[in-house]
C-alpha cells in the first residue's frame, strides 16, 4: 500500500450495506477474503485522503418504510435494532465519515447522497459493498446517470458468484471495474478522464 498521498479531491468511496443480513452462507463461502479486502480498501482511502461515505439499509419495525414487495411478504432485511442490521466491525465508519441511512436499492434516491457529493465537489465515485447485483449496481448506475465517473471495486463487492460475475461484466457502459491494489496506480488515468470532460 502506498504511503504517498495523491490528488484525490474529486474522488469519494461509497461503501454500501456491509451488514449482517446481506452476508449469506453462499456469499461467505465464495468470498472468504472479503472482510480483509474491505478493511484494506478503507485503510487505503483513509491513508490517501479519499473521502468515504457509508450507505446503510435500515427499516422501521412497523413496516411504514418497507418497500411494497417486502410488506406483502412480511419480511425485511436490516430492520432497526436487529442483529441483521448491524455493520461488520471491519466496515465501521471512522473520524467523522458520513453515514447515510437508506430505504431503497439506489443510494441516490433520497437526494442526501448527491447533495453531499455536490457540496464536496466529487466527480469520480468508487463503489463497493453488498450486494453486487442489487444495491451496488443500482447505486453505481444512479451515479453514472447523474454525471459522475464510476469504478466498482470488484474485490470489495460480493454476491452469489454467478450474479457477481455477470454484473461486473455486463455494464461496461455504466462503470469501470477496479481492485484495491489498482486504485493508486489508476489515479492518473482517472484524472485524465476528468480533465477530458472539462474540455
Question: What role is predicted for each listed range?
Answer:
Residues 12-18:
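Acidic-leg catalytic submotif of subtilisin-like serine proteases
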Residues 18, 57-59, 155:
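Active-site loop/turn elements of alpha/beta-hydrolase fold enzymes
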Residues 51-52, 56-75:
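Early exported N-terminus immediately downstream of N-terminal targeting peptides
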Residues 9, 27-58:
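A short alpha/beta connector and helix-capping loop motif
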Amino acid at each position: 500500500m502506498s504511503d504517498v498521498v495523491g490528488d484525490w479531491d474529486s474522488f469519494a468511496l461509497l461503501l454500501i450495506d456491509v451488514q449482517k443480513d446481506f452476508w449469506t452462507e453462499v456469499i461467505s463461502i465464495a468470498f472468504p477474503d472479503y472482510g480483509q479486502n474491505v478493511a484494506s480498501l478503507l485503510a487505503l482511502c483513509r491513508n490517501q485522503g479519499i473521502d468515504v461515505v457509508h450507505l446503510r439499509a435500515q427499516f422501521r419495525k412497523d413496516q411504514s418504510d418497507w418497500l411494497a414487495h417486502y410488506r406483502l411478504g412480511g419480511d425485511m432485511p436490516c430492520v432497526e435494532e436487529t442483529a441483521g442490521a448491524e455493520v461488520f466491525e471491519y466496515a465501521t465508519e471512522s473520524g467523522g465519515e458520513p453515514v447515510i441511512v437508506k430505504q431503497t436499492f439506489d443510494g441516490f434516491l433520497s437526494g442526501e447522497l448527491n447533495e453531499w457529493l455536490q457540496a464536496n465537489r466529487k466527480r469520480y465515485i468508487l463503489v463497493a459493498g453488498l450486494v453486487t447485483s442489487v444495491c451496488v449496481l443500482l447505486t453505481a448506475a444512479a451515479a453514472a446517470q447523474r454525471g459522475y465517473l464510476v469504478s466498482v471495486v470488484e474485490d470489495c463487492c460480493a454476491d452469489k458468484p454467478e450474479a457477481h460475475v455477470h454484473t461486473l461484466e455486463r455494464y461496461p457502459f455504466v462503470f469501470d471495474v477496479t481492485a484495491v491494489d489498482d486504485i493508486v496506480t489508476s489515479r492518473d488515468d482517472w484524472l485524465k478522464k476528468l480533465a477530458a470532460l472539462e474540455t
